[in-house]
Amino acid sequence: ITMKKILFIGLSIAAMISCSRAKETIEYGDYQDNTSENPTKMAKVIYGEDHSMISNPERGFCTRNGYHSRSSVISDYEINTLKSSKHTLVFFDFKLKEFISSPINSDMLGMMQRNFDKLRANGIKAVVRFTYSSSTSAAVYDAEPSIVLKHISQLKPILEKNKDVIALIEAGFIGAYGEWYYSTHYGNKGQADYAKRRTIINAMLDAFPKERMIAVRTPLIKTNLLNISLNSPLTQSEAFNRSNKARLGHHNDCFLADEKDRGTYTGEQDKKYTQLDSKYTVVGGETCTPPTSYSQCNAALQTMGKYHWSYLNLSYHQDMIADWKNTHCFEEIQKRLGYRFVMKEVQYTEKMESGKNYK
């Protein structure tokens, strides 16, 4: 069996195989079967690629849902909308503002579990983030390290229990929106306190499921956390070994805004690093501006390919999403986000006899 794997973004474990019966052809010929005495006639089936939208898990568009302790679970309407749109992901932003100086209460933890149960019952997975503030004008952006560490320990069992419906975890916790920029306790850009930040990310890597990656906001955050240079992207031999380097991925929440995506990148070196590193990590995020020259269809598709994008938040920025729909680019992006497995051909023994081994 011969297959090709078309990767537009990052990685996922499972896939649905898509074949087009319309282009199916059968060829016959004599192929040497090394497991039997004589050459055996083999048949070969060649398939054409199905270019339709495939609802593969852990990839594609997602919508953002914010929850606090008094929230109800994701509604049946939202679930049905996801399914009818062939979306397999939802973004859960668990808001911890009311626990910024105290442990997470049982109501909040119970609400999280009910949401994960609802996803499991409907074959959907979540991108998960935990935040303390949802505005750059918030009086306090994040909790003190001792509180965050307590929260991480509280979250450990629930995330482990539900790792089957969690696609990835965004680093969160620090800064406005959990994006590690405007921060109360961990330093701001240019004065970031990486000793404290490493304490938090190391606790997350230790406590959260080893099978899941944690996405950070910029490439320099990853390299600074790991004390490595931009000349050290993941290699094939390092990929998926569950080391901290292999488990840290990327989320860009100002995608296609301008040349540097509003500070996501500082220059060409960290762009190149991310293009190489992202071959083996999860990558996703959201847009943050109205349409730009960088978001025009061909440019957007090319950039998503270079950075191996897996998922994109549909909730923001609405003007850019609308522009993709108006220019007939939306469906193409939806199809290409993530991965596709395509069966190209199958060879099999045309006739078999009892007692012999065949391919």
Each model region followed by its residue ranges:
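Aromatic-lined substrate-binding rim segments of carbohydrate-active enzymes
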Residues: 75-133, 145-148, 208, 212
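Boundary/entry segment of secreted carbohydrate-active catalytic domains
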Residues: 31-89, 93-95
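Active-site groove signature of glycoside hydrolases
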Residues: 127-137, 155-191
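An active-site-proximal structural segment forming one wall of the substrate-binding cleft
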Residues: 108-125, 142-168, 193-207
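Structural beta-strand segments of beta-rich domains
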Residues: 356-358
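Bacterial Sec-dependent N-terminal signal peptides
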Residues: 1-30
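Catalytic-core regions of glycoside hydrolase
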Residues: 168-170, 179, 183-319
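Catalytic cores of secreted or luminal carbohydrate-active enzymes
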Residues: 296-351
